[in-house]
């Protein structure tokens, strides 16, 4: 009998390396607004609290809320087209998930990434893995 019955994983930065697609999308927004861009390492420190927070932390200090919201709208349009371009599983993750399935340990994903993105990325990269639940950010 297994000591563990189930494991819940985060998506970004845990199962998938998504930093390049996210960073490229935010930098494209910043270029449109004539703001300085950031490198991938900078974005690693800005991620974790959702896209609005990411934009708030990426625009220069003192940027007004209206500009941030316009930037967020543009980011979503850009990221819709880019979110699968450079994203990939971390080395060994697919094998780990496969072994957990073989052991009968239930696997779930809980992410603050939008639910549609979360499900599409799981289907793309882990189509042979059985997940009990996949949850991304949802309205309400």
Describe the residue ranges of each PLM region.
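N-terminal helical cap/lid subdomain that shapes the substrate entry/recognition surface
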Residues: 2-91, 103, 116-119
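Short linear capping/connector segments at secondary-structure termini
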Residues: 40, 92-94, 133-137
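Residues at the starts of beta-strands that form the adenosine-phosphate
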Residues: 106
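Nucleotide and nucleotide-moiety/phosphate-recognizing core
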Residues: 93, 100, 127
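Substrate-recognition "cap/lid" segment bordering the active-site pocket of phosphatases
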Residues: 86-88, 114-140
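A broad, structure-centric signal for solvent-exposed, well-ordered loop/edge residues
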Residues: 54, 96-97
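Core-facing hydrophobic residues within beta-strands of well-ordered domains
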Residues: 4, 97, 129-132
């Amino acid at each position: 009998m297994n000591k563990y019955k189930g494991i819940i994983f985060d998506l970004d930065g845990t199962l998938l390396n998504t930093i390049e697609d996210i960073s490229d999308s935010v930098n494209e927004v910043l270029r449109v607004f004539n703001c300085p861009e950031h490198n991938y390492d900078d974005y690693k420190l800005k991620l974790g609290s959702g896209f609005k927070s990411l934009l708030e932390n990426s625009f220069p200090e003192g940027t007004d809320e209206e500009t941030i919201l316009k930037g967020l709208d543009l980011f979503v349009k850009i990221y819709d087209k880019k979110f699968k371009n450079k994203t990939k599983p971390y080395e060994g993750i697919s094998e780990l998930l496969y072994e957990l399935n073989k052991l009968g340990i239930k696997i779930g994903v809980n992410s603050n990434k939008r639910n549609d993105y979360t499900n599409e990325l799981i289907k793309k990269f882990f189509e042979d893995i059985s997940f009990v639940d996949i949850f991304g950010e949802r309205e309400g």
